[in-house]
Each structure stands twice: as structure tokens, then as C-alpha cells.
A protein has these predicted regions:
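Bacterial Sec-dependent N-terminal signal peptides
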Residues: 1-12, 271-272
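Cell-envelope and extracellular/periplasmic
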Residues: 12-271
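N-terminal pre-domain segments of enzymes
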Residues: 270-295
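Structural beta-strand segments of beta-rich domains
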Residues: 297-301
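Short proline/glycine-enriched turn/loop motifs at strand-loop junctions of beta-rich domains
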Residues: 304-309
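Short beta-strand segments within Ig-like beta-sandwich modules, predominantly Fibronectin type-III
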Residues: 321-326
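Conserved small/polar residues in nucleotide/adenosyl-binding loops
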Residues: 334-335
Length: 336
């Protein structure tokens, strides 16, 4: 037993940060991903929770975190740019992995161990086939995959985006707490080491049809001490005013990452902060404040081009994909 424990300890990489992602359709991914969303740093990985023949993914194996992360025929999720942003802002030796289980249209009860079976009995017909992909038990699949992930890295947090189907449910925070507590117990995690990061639904400022649920989501930190809430203020959405659009998911993912980094004691720099703490680098882009270099030899690129669909930074002939956020196109690189 001692030998087995030693071998497991050696195999586990303390610099491989694992995040569990669960929820309903906005975590599942409702927006069509674009070319910029399919290119990803090798340091960002996804553990397939279901087989995906189209992408050649096998359940329980690690792959580059190229969209779609959840299942075949799903779209862009907050986790996509959550992982990208962490990779951009953490040292090069740190890798990020996500374990992703989400079911469109589900109530939080689907992830409650003592409610799942009863919930599935009354699940709508359109949800049945999706549930079968998780053997009719998404919570158990999440735990199963999380245990596989723990052999490779360390679980650093749990990302939740759910609530639309529980709109107005004042008991929702306690129900979420039961899911969180069960995950901690089943995976032998400590609450003070593994925060829950929960996102708001489409905001009232964009006509969110479930925006009233954000008042309930705001109550989560009252029942879960190690909890952070991700604002949806200002995020663009789909015409149904229920789901975010691709641009909204990208920014939402960065906001999730900003909360995770904050909990690590790292603040995600704003463009103004970058300018204050960096120096301009030589460039042929006359009159531009970017690129800039900081004391850790990180290069910041930023460009405002709202009508462009894809943008790359060209550094010595090597091209790096830039990502869109609320301030424009951006890219952060470690330089030697």
C-alpha cells in the first residue's frame, strides 16, 4: 500500500491545476464556436467525460482543450476562455485541465445525489438521450472523471453555471451547497482549498429572461464560505435572451478566470494597469501603446478591431492567436 501511495504521489503533478465544470446549457455551450476558438495552447487540457468520435476523443483521456469541451454538437462555454486566461496569466510550468459535465435545461436537482433518480423519471423527452451519455447520472460521471483527473493533477476549484431552470427557487443556494459538499467529500477535498466559482445568468441590462435569478445566485456566499460570484453585467447574449453569444462566453470565461486568479492572490490586469507597470516594446505599429513588456518578461498585445473575426500577433515570424474580451483583442506571451 505504501508503494502504491508513493507511485501515485509521483504521478500527480502539483502544477497541473484541475477545475470541475458543471451546470446547464450555458455551461454546456450554446454558441457556435469560431476559428479563433479552435486554436489552443497545449498547456490547456480537457478530460473527455464522454466519447467524441468526431474529434477522436475517448472518455477518461486528456486532450488539448479545443472546442467543443462538453460533448459532440455542443458549443463555446465559459470554460474555454477560463482556461485560456489562466494559461496566459500563470507561469509557463503551470498547466490547466478541465473536467466538464453539463446538461442543457436541467435543474440543480439533477446533480444532487439524493434527487437525481427521481428527477430523471420526469425529465423531458429531449433530455433523455443526453442523460444516457452520462449513464443517467451526471454527478457520478463527474466524480468518476474527477478521480481520473486527480491521478494527473490537483483539483483547484469548481465552476458552476446553472440557475435558469431554478429561477425564483430560494432554496437553490442550499441545493448547490449539497452538491458542493458531496463533491468535497467524494473527492477528499478541503473546502478552504477548493472554491466554488458561480456565474450569473444573462443580465437584466441585456434583457435576460431569467435575470431575477441573479439575486438568488448572489446569496451563495452566505451558505458557502469559499465562494465567488462572476458578474454577467454587460455581456452580450443570443436572441433568446437566455444564452450568451460567443463574444459573451469569451468575456464570461475571462471573468471566471479573474475570480480564480484573485483567489490565488493574482489580479488580472486591466489595459490601464498594463500600461502603468510595463514598458513599450519596439514595434512597427506607429502610435500604438502595445505591445508592452513587464518585469517578468511577459509581452502584452492589444488591438481594437471590433469588425475583425480573427486576429494574430506575429512575433519573429511565429503567429499567436489573439482573443476578444470587453476591451478588444488581446494576447499575453512569455518571452525568453
Amino acid at each position: 500500500c505504501l508503494l502504491c501511495a508513493s507511485l501515485c504521489a509521483v504521478a500527480q503533478d502539483a502544477n497541473f491545476y484541475i477545475y470541475l465544470c458543471l451546470g446547464q446549457s450555458n455551461m454546456e455551450g450554446n454558441a457556435r464556436y469560431e476559428a479563433q476558438d479552435t486554436l489552443v495552447d497545449a498547456r490547456f487540457q480537457v478530460l473527455a467525460a464522454v466519447d467524441n468520435k468526431e474529434l477522436g476523443r475517448v472518455k477518461g483521456e486528456w486532450y488539448p482543450a479545443r472546442a467543443p469541451l462538453c460533448r459532440p454538437n455542443t458549443g463555446l462555454t465559459p470554460a474555454d476562455y477560463f482556461g485560456r486566461t489562466l494559461v496566459e496569466n500563470l507561469p509557463p510550468h503551470v498547466r490547466i485541465g478541465v473536467v466538464h459535465v453539463a446538461i442543457g435545461g436541467c435543474r440543480i436537482e439533477l446533480f444532487q445525489k439524493d434527487k437525481c433518480e427521481e428527477y430523471i423519471k420526469t425529465a423531458p423527452d429531449w433530455m433523455v438521450n443526453t442523460l444516457k451519455e452520462y449513464d443517467n447520472d451526471p454527478y457520478t460521471r463527474l466524480v468518476e472523471m474527477a478521480r481520473i483527473a486527480q491521478k494527473s493533477g490537483v483539483i483547484k476549484g469548481i465552476l458552476l453555471h446553472q440557475g435558469e431552470s431554478n429561477t425564483g427557487d430560494k432554496e437553490w443556494p442550499q441545493k448547490v451547497k449539497s452538491v458542493y459538499d458531496n463533491l468535497l467529500a467524494d473527492l477528499h477535498l478541503q473546502a478552504d482549498e477548493v472554491p466554488l466559482i458561480a456565474g450569473e445568468v444573462v443580465n437584466a441590462d441585456h434583457g435576460g429572461v431569467c435575470a431575477g435569478m441573479n439575486e438568488v445566485i448572489a446569496m451563495l456566499p452566505q451558505v458557502i464560505k469559499n465562494c465567488a460570484i462572476v458578474s454577467s453585467k454587460g455581456l452580450s447574449c443570443a436572441p433568446d435572451h437566455l444564452h450568451f453569444d460567443a463574444a459573451g462566453y469569451r468575456v464570461l470565461g475571462r471573468r471566471y478566470a479573474a475570480q480564480a486568479l484573485h483567489l490565488m492572490g493574482i489580479e488580472l490586469p486591466s489595459p490601464d494597469d498594463v500600461c502603468k507597470h510595463t514598458v513599450a516594446a519596439p514595434t512597427n505599429m506607429h502610435g500604438s501603446d502595445f505591445p508592452r513588456i513587464d518585469k517578468d518578461n511577459r509581452a502584452y498585445f492589444r488591438c481594437y478591431a471590433p469588425d475583425v473575426k480573427r486576429l494574430q500577433a506575429d512575433v519573429c515570424g511565429k503567429k499567436y492567436e489573439m482573443a476578444m474580451d470587453e476591451h478588444g483583442w488581446c494576447c499575453l506571451l512569455y518571452t525568453s
